[in-house]
Amino acid sequence: MKLDPKVYQLEFFREKGFTRKQCRVCGEYFWTLNPDQEHCNDAPCVEYYFWELPRVRGLSVRDARRKFIEFFKRHGHEYVEPRPVVARWREDLYLTIASIVAFQPHVTSGIVPPPANPLVIVQPCIRLEDIDFVGLTIGRHLTSFEMGGHHAFNYPDKTVYWKEETVRFAFEFFTKELGIPEDMVTFKESWWEGGGNAGPSFEVTVGGLELATLVFMQYRVVDGKYEPMDIRVVDTGYGIERIAWFSQDVPTAFHAIYGELLDEFRKLLGVAEPPRELLWGAARAAGRLDPEDPESVERYYQVVAERAGLSIREARELLGREAALYTLLDHTKTIALMLGDGIVPSNTGEGYLARLVIRRALRTLRRLGADIELAVLVERQARYWGADYYPRLLSHLDYILRVVRLEEERYSKTLERGLREVTKLLKRKKKLSIDDLITLYDSHGVPPDMVAEAASKLGVNVDVPHNFYALVAKKHGASGAVAREVEEKPKLPRDIEEWARGFPATRRLFHENPYAREFTANLLGVRGSHVILDATLFYPTGGGQLHDTGVLRLCGEEYRVLRVEKVGDVVVHVLDREPSCSSGEAWGRIDWDRRYRLMRHHTAVHVLLGAARRVLGDHVWQAGAEKTPEKARLDITHYELPSREEIRKIEELANSAILARIHVDIEEIDRNTAEKLYGFRIYQGGVPMTPRLRIVRIGDWDVEACFGTHVANTAEIGAIKIVNVEKLQDGVVRFEIVAGSEVARYAASLEDKLDTIASIVGGGRGEAVKRVEKLAEELKEAKRQVSRLRSFLADMLVKSVKATAKSIDGVKVYVMTEELPDENIYREVMLKLSREEPDSITIAVIRRGEDLLMEIGAGSKAAKRVDLRAVAKQLASKGLRGGGKPSHITLYGRGLAEKASKVASEVVEVIASLVSRAGTA
C-alpha cells in the first residue's frame, strides 16, 4: 500500500530534531539524529557493530524480560500473563506467532474488551517461516522467541495513545533503560501485515540489529483491499532475546540466550569451539548476510574466510558445524515448548508442525554424527527454561520425553521405508520438482538433502530450495494461512441462509429450560418448508450434537420437524411440508426421549474427556465429537492407541464421576473472566465468536465452553460403556460410547450375539467360550494339516511339471494348467521351481469362473535374460492386463477361461521370442 510520507512525520521527531533520510543500500526511509548517517542500520544493509556502542551490559533473557515489563508498568500499563504457544483460542491459526495474536480476533474486532488497556505482555512465540535460516544468521532468525508487546486499543470514542506516545516510549526505553546514545537509535519506515490486519510501522534499529517493531494497526485486509478498522491498535514487538544479545559482549544470540547450556550442548554434541577470530568475524559479517540470496551466502563465507585466514572450505565446514549446534539449541527448545503446551505430533495441523521441527532436529543430529538421543537434549532445555518462565516444561516433562523418544523411533522406521520409495521414484523420473521433494518429505519422511544424495548416486541432479522447510511449514499453516477445521457448518441452501440472516436472534428456550417438552412462540417467517420462530425449544445441530425432532402446530395444523439448523443466532426449523400460513402463534413439542438420550450422551462425552485426561495425560484435547441418540463419539489427541488397561481405567473413572452425582453448572460469563477462571481448556469444541461464553462445568471434573444441552447431574447419565476405541489417524484416537438406556440396549445386543454363537457351537452361554476355544484349536490344527498337504501336493506337482519342460535356448519353460482347489499351491510350485531351477520360467494358468489369471515367475538366471514386464507389455494386446517385477508378473484376462490352452501357448511364444532376442547368457 502506497502511503503519504506524512504518515511517518511525528511531532516527537520535530521536537527532538530527527532527520528523515533514505538508506543508500535498500532505498527505504528512516529517521535519525545523526546527520551523517547513510544507512538504515538494519540487516542486510550494514554489518553488525552494536558491540562497539555504549549501552547497559550483561542482561540475561530474564533480565531483559523483567526490565521491559517494569518499564511499561511504570508508564501505566497493566501486566497480562502470556498465553500458550498453541493458539487454542483461535480457529484460523495453529501457533502463537506474535504477542498481538493473544488478542486477535476477539479484542481487535471489538467483540470483547481487552483484559487491560493499555497492557504489557511478554509472549513466548513460535514462528517457522524462517526455520531454514536458524543458525546460519547467528541469531537473527529463531523458531521460538519471546516477544515483548505493549498494546493499546483505541476506540472511536476513546483514544488511549497512538503513534506519538508509542515512539516516545520506544526512544525512552532504549536510551534511558538500555543506555543507548540517542543518535544511535534509528526509526525505519515500514509497513506491516498479518492475521488479516495491516498498518504503517517503524522498525527500531541500532548498530545493525533490529530491536523492535512498532505497528499501528488500522486496516483490515478483505479480499486484498484495505478497510479502516473501528479499533486502531498499537501493536509493538520488542525482541527480548535480541535485547539480551545486544547488551552482552558475545558473538551470537545463542551465547546470550543459552549461556552455560550452549557449552553443555557443545560437549554433548562434540562440536569444538571455532577460532575466536572466525566466530567474531562471522558475527559481524552476518549483518550483511541475506540468507535468501545464494550469492549473498557465498560472499558471506568468502569474507569470513579471508578475515580468519582460512580457505572457504574450512570456514564453511567450521561454521556449518557451529550452525548445526545453534539449530539444535533452537529446535530442542521449540520442541519442549510445543509438547509442553500439549501438542501431539501427527500428520495434520499443529501436530504436523511439531513433527517437522522434531524431524529437522533429528536430521541435524545425524548430520553432525553425534551419538546421543534427541530426548537428552530436549530434557536439558526443559530443565533450563522450566525453572524460569515455563513451569509447564517441568510438570509435563515425562510426556515431552516419551513423545520425543517415540518420534525418534518412528522416524528411523519411516526413513528406511522412505528411502526405498526415493529409489523407485528416481528410476522413473530423471528430474525431481519441489513438489516431488515436498511429497517425499510429507508422505515418506525423507529430507531433501538425503534425496539429493541418493539421486547423485544414480546420476540425477536435484536442486534443493534454500527455504525447503519453510515451504513445507507454510503449506501446513505455520504462517496462519490455513484455518483449523470447524465442525459445524450450516446445511441449508444459500438462499435460505441469506433469508434467515434478516431475522432477529431466536430466544433459546432449549438453554433456558432443557427439561421442558412443550412451548409456545410466534411465527416470524416461512419460506417453503423452512420456518423461523421468535423462540424455540428445538435444539439445532451444533457442538457436535444432533438436532431435535418433534411436532409444530401452525394455523391449526400439525407438522413434523425433521431437522433444525442455526444460521448465526437464528434457528431455522425444517418441516415435512410447507405451512399454510406465515404468521400467528405456534405450539411445539419435542420428541423428549430422543432429546434426553442426546443430553445424556453430551454430558457423558464431557465426563469421558475428563477421565481420558486423568489417565492418558494433560496433553489430551478434543479433536472432534458427535452425539446422537444411539451413541456418541469423542476424538482425542494422543500419540498411540491406549492399552486395554488404560481403556478400562478411563471407563471406570468416567463411571465413578457418574456415581459421585456431580452437579452440572451452566452459566454465561464474559470471555475474559472465563479465560482467567478456567484457562484455554474451555475451547474444546471450537471457539465461539461471542463476547460471552456459555460455560458447562462439571464440578472439578471438566469445564468447557459449550452450546449443547446437558443433564443437571452426572447421576442422570446412568452409566457409560466404551464400545470401541480405534486410531483414527496419526495422533488422534476415537472413542465410541453408549450411555444411559443405550447401555442396556448395547448389553442386550451382546447377549443376542452370545446366544447366536452358543447355538452355532452347541451348548448354553456358559459353555460358549470353552467351545469357541476348542474350535479355534481345531482350526489351527486343520490349517497345519492343510499346509502339510499343500506342501506334499506341491512337491508332487513339481515332479509332474518338470516332465513337461520345454527348453528354449537354454531357458526351461514350465506350464501348469491343472485345476487345483487352492491357488496358493500354484504359487508354492512356482517358488520351488524358481529356486531349484534358476534358469527356468514357470507359467501358472488359473481359471476363475469365466476369467483367467496367470502367474509367471522366473528363476534368478532366467530373470537376467528376460524381463517379465516386457512379456506383460506384449500380452496386453491379447486381452491380458497386469504387471509386476522383472522376475514375477500377474496377468488377468476377462472371459478367457475357455481359451486357457491357446493363451498359454501364446505366452510361451512371446517368452521364446524374447529369449531368442536376448541371446545366450
Swiss-Prot record:
GO molecular function: alanine-tRNA ligase activity; aminoacyl-tRNA deacylase activity; ATP binding; tRNA binding; zinc ion binding
EC category: ligase
Cofactor note: Binds 1 zinc ion per subunit.
Principal subcellular localisation of the protein: cytoplasm
GO cellular component: cytoplasm
Gene Ontology biological-process entries: alanyl-tRNA aminoacylation
Compartment(s) where it occurs, according to its Swiss-Prot or TrEMBL record: Cytoplasm
SUPFAM superfamilies, sorted: Class II aaRS and biotin synthetases, Putative anticodon-binding domain of alanyl-tRNA synthetase (AlaRS), ThrRS/AlaRS common domain, Translation proteins
Protein family per UniProt: Belongs to the class-II aminoacyl-tRNA synthetase family.
Function (record text): Catalyzes the attachment of alanine to tRNA(Ala) in a two-step reaction: alanine is first activated by ATP to form Ala-AMP and then transferred to the acceptor end of tRNA(Ala). Also edits incorrectly charged Ser-tRNA(Ala) and Gly-tRNA(Ala) via its editing domain.
Name recorded for this polypeptide: Alanine--tRNA ligase
Organism (species): Hyperthermus butylicus (strain DSM 5456 / JCM 9403 / PLM1-5)
Native organism taxonomy: Archaea, Thermoproteota, Thermoprotei, Desulfurococcales, Pyrodictiaceae
